[in-house]
């Protein structure tokens, strides 16, 4: 492990907190849901200053007038040699100061040289009318503890404030700070004093809210921000935040995660309907349940998971995403690389009617949801008009379990693998399926050493081309995990297998005479190492596992009387078109996985 130690005192700007005349309730710092860009979905832990500036330039010239203004540098900006598809925990080169506070890696952020930190980059953004944000991990750096570095403004050291208990399972840069230890609050004060001096406007604090909600550290962070005198919007991560802490997080943060990492998966998007219903009553001005970043545009360029791609969401699914986020009033943090945006993506995220709903609507609430359709309603406080969002969420049943020739027990961290030995009796079809059990977070699974048997002969399934293959996140991979890493189950590495994420089905045409299939189904290390999710079931089918495909579109009927309307004028907010006057019922045809967003204006008879 290497690190760069910077001595404090290089710049006078670090010597005292930035005073900006901050007054009153911190909720006033985010009067509408924050809108911005975050580097995670496209650059993972490897983003550079040039890439941040390129996205800022695009935002300033094309998007700022629509309300997009936060530019957030995500995880591990203090590591000079991090990597995509995971984290470099083998020999990370940390940049850290003499008080145990991380500093930007100067090989990635050249303007930080000479102890200037992120101030030059923040100044660059501020001159463009933008706001600057960073991601940090909860706690105190492990390297600060190992070096027994002092806590600024005290006679104590990092050793006096830490505990190894409850260390983050998926990244080991930090130790827990024990709230009741002397020096604990002072350490948080010191890092936010530094961030305020840089000109920070937004902080995302990770490993703070799920699966353990660290009440004491949330409160210390809140106090440290208030002490700076600078309005720094606070976002907590990851999710789902335990809902029994909803009141506390609403009273201490501006936004908090309601889900785990959200990627361009329809199954994950569909899950948000349940999640947003659960969290709807906890939204308040300046306090927003967060549906996570928008995996739109070009993502996965050097991501922690996944390959470079334009979003896998169809256009209809993108309309669903933006319609749902706006009617729920979730923060909008764009995950793609702005310079790669196409005209459609820009039009989607700058639609003035959608953004009006996001910023101005009140009394937002679900109207109904069933297996096929959903609807939300809200009001315009300016004139009493209704905002109506409708969604066609119908799917075909992916796996009818009663059809399975074999299925495993629930595979989780306690029971992380199961052997498969199935007689096929000459079947010419084979479907390998993995289903989610409890939720869809980190359901990464591996088919290890999948082998077809024909008498005494064997054929590795990895040598055959599949007919069709799906994965709930990413894409199925041969001899690699779904995230692109090695196949690792229960700590053991394998060279032969298939990596997927639930829900997944891989279909094969088999050679004649195959009488047996063997394999091991196991939870992949990437999922097993997380704090949440990773509960799956393996299934093998010899016939089509799914049900019939739903129609390409469906009519959604809205009883206007249930909305307190007899007759109304309807405007399509996405297109801006006036659709006419409707009495008693409003009916509209919506594409599969698509959405509509409408303004309903009462018409007096």
List PLM regions with ranges.
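Catalytic cores of secreted or luminal carbohydrate-active enzymes
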Residues: 320-369, 596-597
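Glycan-recognition surfaces
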Residues: 161-166, 179-180, 186, 231-337
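Structural recognition of the beta-strand scaffold that forms the well-ordered cores
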Residues: 29, 33-39, 69-74, 79, ...
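C-terminal beta-strand-rich structural cap/linker in extracellular carbohydrate-active enzymes
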Residues: 582-605
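Carbohydrate-binding surface patches
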Residues: 319, 325-328, 333-335, 370-400, ...
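Gly-Asp-aromatic-enriched flexible segments
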Residues: 400-549, 581, 592
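Bacterial Sec-dependent N-terminal signal peptides
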Residues: 1-20
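Aromatic-lined carbohydrate-binding/catalytic grooves of carbohydrate-active enzymes
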Residues: 60-124, 128-207, 211
């Amino acid at each position: 492990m290497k690190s760069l130690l910077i001595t404090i005192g290089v710049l006078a700007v670090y010597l005292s907190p930035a005073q900006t005349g901050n007054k009153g309730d911190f909720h006033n710092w985010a009067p509408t849901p924050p809108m911005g860009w975050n580097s995670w979905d496209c650059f993972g832990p490897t983003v550079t200053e040039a890439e941040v500036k390129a996205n800022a330039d695009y935002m300033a010239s094309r998007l700022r007038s629509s309300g997009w203004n936060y530019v957030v540098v995500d995880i591990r900006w203090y590591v000079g040699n991090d990597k995509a598809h995971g984290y470099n925990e083998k020999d990370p080169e940390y940049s850290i100061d003499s008080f145990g506070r991380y500093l930007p890696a100067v090989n990635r952020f050249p303007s930080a040289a000479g102890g200037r930190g992120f101030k030059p980059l923040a100044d660059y953004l501020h001159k463009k009318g933008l706001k600057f944000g960073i991601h940090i991990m909860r706690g105190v750096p492990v390297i600060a503890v190992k070096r027994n570095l002092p806590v600024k403004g005290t006679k104590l050291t990092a050793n006096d404030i830490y505990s190894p208990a409850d260390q983050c399972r998926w990244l080991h840069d930090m130790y827990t700070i024990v709230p009741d230890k002397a020096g604990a609050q002072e350490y948080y004060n010191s890092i936010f004093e530094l961030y305020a001096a840089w000109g920070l406007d937004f902080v995302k604090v990770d490993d703070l809210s799920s699966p353990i909600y660290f009440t004491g550290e949330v409160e210390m962070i809140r106090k440290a921000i208030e002490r700076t005198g600078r309005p720094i919007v606070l976002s907590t991560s990851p999710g789902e935040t335990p809902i029994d802490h909803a009141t506390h997080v609403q009273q201490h943060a501006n936004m908090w995660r309601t889900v785990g990492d959200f990627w361009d998966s329809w199954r994950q998007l569909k899950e948000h309907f349940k999640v947003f219903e659960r969290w709807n009553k906890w939204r308040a001005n300046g306090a927003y349940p967060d549906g996570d970043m928008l995996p739109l545009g070009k993502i996965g360029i050097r991501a922690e998971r996944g390959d470079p791609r334009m979003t896998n969401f169809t256009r209809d699914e993108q309309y669903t995403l933006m319609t749902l986020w706006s009617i729920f009033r979730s923060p909008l943090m764009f995950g793609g690389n702005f310079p790669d945006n196409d005209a459609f993506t820009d039009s989607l995220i700058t639609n003035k009617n959608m953004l009006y709903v996001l910023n101005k609507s009140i009394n937002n609430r679900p109207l109904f949801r069933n297996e096929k359709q959903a609807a939300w309603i809200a009001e315009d406080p300016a004139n009493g008009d209704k905002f109506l969002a409708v969604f066609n969420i119908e799917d075909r049943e992916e796996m009818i379990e009663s059809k399975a020739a074999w299925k495993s027990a629930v595979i989780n961290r306690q029971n992380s693998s199961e052997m498969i030995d199935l007689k096929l009796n000459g079947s010419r079809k084979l479907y390998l399926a993995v289903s989610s059990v409890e939720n869809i977070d980190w359901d990464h699974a591996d088919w290890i050493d999948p082998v077809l048997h024909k008498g005494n002969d064997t054929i590795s399934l990895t040598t055959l081309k599949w007919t069709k293959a799906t994965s709930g996140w990413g894409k199925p991979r041969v001899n690699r995990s779904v995230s692109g890493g090695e196949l690792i189950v229960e700590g053991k590495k394998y060279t032969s297998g298939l990596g997927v994420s639930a829900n997944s089905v891989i279909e094969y045409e088999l050679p004649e005479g195959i009488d047996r299939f063997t394999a091991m189904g196991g939870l992949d290390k990437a999922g097993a190492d997380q704090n949440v999710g990773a509960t799956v079931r393996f299934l093998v089918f010899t016939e089509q596992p799914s049900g019939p495909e739903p129609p390409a579109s469906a009519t959604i009927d809205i009883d206007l009387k249930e909305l307190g309307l007899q007759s109304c004028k309807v405007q399509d907010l996405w297109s801006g078109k006036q659709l006419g006057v409707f009495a008693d019922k409003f009916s509209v045809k919506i594409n599969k996985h698509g959405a509509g967003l409408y303004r309903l204006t009462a018409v007096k008879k």
